[in-house]
Amino acid sequence: MFFQTGLLLSLSLWTKVAYAAFGITTSSSSYVIDAGSANPLKFTVSRSSCDITSINYSGTELQYASKGSHISSGLGRATVSATQDGDYIKVTCATSTLTHYMVVHHGDSTIHMATHITAEPSIGELRFIARLKSDVLPNEEPFGDVSTTAGGTAIEGSDVFLVNGKTRSKFYSSQRFIDDQRHCISGSAHRVCMILNQYESSSGGPFHRDIDANNGGGFNALYWYMNSGHVQTEPYRMGLHGPYSMVFSRSGMPGTNIDTSFFANLNIKGYVPASGRGTVTGKASGADSRMKWVVHWHNTAAQYWTYTASDGSFTSPAMKPGTYTMVYYQGEYKVAETSVTVRAGSKITKNISGSVKTGKTIFKIGEWDGQPTGFRNADKQLRMHPSDSRMAAWGPLTYTVGRSAPSDFPMAVFKSVNNPVTIKFTASAAQTAAATLRIGTTLSFAGGRPQAKINSYTAAAPPAPKNLDSRGVTRGAYRGLGEVYDVAIPAGTIVAGVNTITISVVSGNSGEKFLSPNFVFDCVELFQ
């Protein structure tokens, strides 16, 4: 009995000691941070480079041994310090243009981070990459092995691979920022998730997407891309990026509603607390009610967004003070734009209204939603290369109005693959007057844009769109600047009876197969 009592007392004391382990252990080369959590989290940070060189969670080493976890491709040299303030530990890594923070709260198996920049990193992108052991954490969530490239053969550049007959790429792990609050990698006994609650200093807007994960063999990479040149549509933002949180768990999926308001008390450069922010409330109206509506605010310093409720009402996230462009989308298609000024501590009311305006429709292929939804291969393009054997034949295709399905129309036209796309339609005598053919696109590559021919009339080629200088469709992207082209059709060009329209890719550039000039369709509408 005495032995059992003593054993229980010893275990109780041991447990208290284990929880009391919260703190910093300093050596000449590193800081070891112990979170003091029930499932123990202990990680090591290099004092010279800011690399995380070890992550031990619940008794298992998760960090890839040959290369650390870090900002960008590593800072190289940095001034690194670690301080403890009550229940919080803060690691600060500083260079002349970048300050990276790692924060641990006593008892939580989470590394909270934020990154402040005054200039873009020399590699041309700002990201955090956790390189974790692929034998312990082999799985990628939520999209599975579409981004597992281990054992593959490169088929495009150094980032698209063929693995067991299927195309894979790290780019196929992406999801839209507005929907990406959490992405993870996992194994049989561990899960590590990146929780993203603050995109205000990132670039690209609510529908931008970037790499989330990539199991390349030796390590499984878990990313948070704050900005990059991957189909980037706007300038990079400086200032504080984050907070963002790397959460460690056993089998459970962590929630996405993480409170990081304690950053306000930690002397984080550029952090704006709730008291220094304001909100915008209002009601959106007029757009197609079959689609989700999004309201988006942006200026050169920050960006925010929210879905509206079913009645169009909305409240913005807490925003930094400033004047913002305010945009209203049906799906991803812009239907209205205005401006609003936000002040600290205030709640501004601002309604917004808009709709798609065309004319009397003769035919419409697709919907004005800013996406290639429903078109051929649009259901697969996010997660595989257009050359993949699982793709339906690209054509060239002919779409007959009134008979063909949306899947008979290609999501994209490639100059060297399926050029042109043909549309056949029957017009009445009343429809032979002057008309407009509106061709909506979502993304252009290598200067690709549409040139239309209506029966014997060939419309002028439009000027080249802005060059985003980034592969798109082949890396799972469909959204760029969303150019819309109007073709004025003279009276008498359309005839009573059967008519033929061809839409071709024109560009002064060239390329092979799916890297030839191309564009992605949103919608095609003929109206008077």
From Swiss-Prot:
EC category name: lyase
Keyword annotations: Carbohydrate metabolism, Cell wall biogenesis/degradation, Disulfide bond, Glycoprotein, Lyase, Polysaccharide degradation, Secreted, Signal
TM ranges: none
A biological process term (GO) from this entry: cell wall organization
Highest taxon of source: Eukaryota
Molecular function as annotated in GO: carbohydrate binding; rhamnogalacturonan endolyase activity
Disulphide connectivity of cysteines: 50-93, 184-193
Catalytic activities: Endotype eliminative cleavage of L-alpha-rhamnopyranosyl-(1->4)-alpha-D-galactopyranosyluronic acid bonds of rhamnogalacturonan I domains in ramified hairy regions of pectin leaving L-rhamnopyranose at the reducing end and 4-deoxy-4,5-unsaturated D-galactopyranosyluronic acid at the non-reducing end
CDD domains reported for this sequence: RGL4_C, RGL4_M, RGL4_N
UniProt-annotated location(s): Secreted
Entries under InterPro entries matching the protein: Carb-bd-like_fold, Gal_mutarotase_sf_dom, Galactose-bd-like_sf, GH-type_carb-bd, RG-lyase_II, RG-lyase_III, Rhamnogalacturonase_B, RhgB_N
Glycosylation sites noted in the Swiss-Prot or TrEMBL record: 56, 351
Gene Ontology cellular component terms for the protein in this record: extracellular region
Principal location listed in the UniProt entry: secreted
Signal peptide from the UniProt entry: 1-20
Family: Belongs to the polysaccharide lyase 4 family.
Annotated function: Pectinolytic enzymes consist of four classes of enzymes: pectin lyase, polygalacturonase, pectin methylesterase and rhamnogalacturonase. Degrades the rhamnogalacturonan I (RG-I) backbone of pectin. Active against linseed rhamnogalacturonan.
Name under which the protein is recorded: Probable rhamnogalacturonate lyase A
Organism: Aspergillus clavatus (strain ATCC 1007 / CBS 513.65 / DSM 816 / NCTC 3887 / NRRL 1 / QM 1276 / 107)
Lineage: Eukaryota, Fungi, Dikarya, Ascomycota, Pezizomycotina
